């Protein structure tokens, strides 16, 4: 019984000292554009810092639509270093309010989430 208790205590201590990377976005994670003409290509840079104590490695950026493209650093981001993620949205064939979410898969405890909101004015409604 003593050996089982010792093993549990050692495992708990090891987990408590584990290193982790963490996203710390330095600006809002939701960007909103009002009254954008259909056909515009929108872009926004999301600046972040790795506030963890291990290098941050982004493996994937999940999007629900091919109209949204994401460019992220492929190299690990050291602790306390800054970098950015570029999100582009193509408004062609998109109308009225559009909401897009980017889910960032990385070696962090929580997934990063970025949001784009845009009101697209259809070509046939523009003056």
Residue positions per predicted region:
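Short, solvent-exposed loop/turn segments enriched in Ser/Thr/Gly
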Residues: 38-45, 92-101
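Sec-dependent N-terminal signal peptides
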Residues: 4-14
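Surface-exposed binding patches on compact interaction domains or structured appendages
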Residues: 53-84
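Short, hydrophobic beta-strand segments
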Residues: 85-93
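Beta-sheet-dominated interaction scaffolds and their linkers
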Residues: 19-45, 120-127
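Terminal connector regions
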Residues: 95-124
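Asparagine-centered strand-capping/turn motif at beta-strand->loop junctions
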Residues: 48-52
């Amino acid at each position: 019984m003593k050996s089982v208790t010792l093993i549990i205590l050692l495992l708990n201590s090891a987990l408590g000292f584990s290193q982790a990377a963490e996203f710390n976005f330095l600006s809002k994670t939701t960007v909103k554009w009002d009254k954008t003409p259909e056909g515009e290509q929108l872009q926004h840079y999301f600046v972040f810092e790795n506030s963890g104590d291990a290098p941050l490695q982004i493996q994937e950026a999940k999007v629900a639509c091919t109209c949204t493209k994401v460019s992220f650093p492929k190299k690990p981001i050291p602790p306390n270093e800054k970098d950015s993620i570029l999100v582009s949205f193509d408004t062609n064939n998109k109308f009225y309010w559009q909401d897009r979410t980017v889910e960032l898969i990385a070696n962090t405890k929580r997934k990063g989430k970025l949001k784009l909101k845009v009101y697209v004015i259809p070509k046939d409604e523009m003056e």
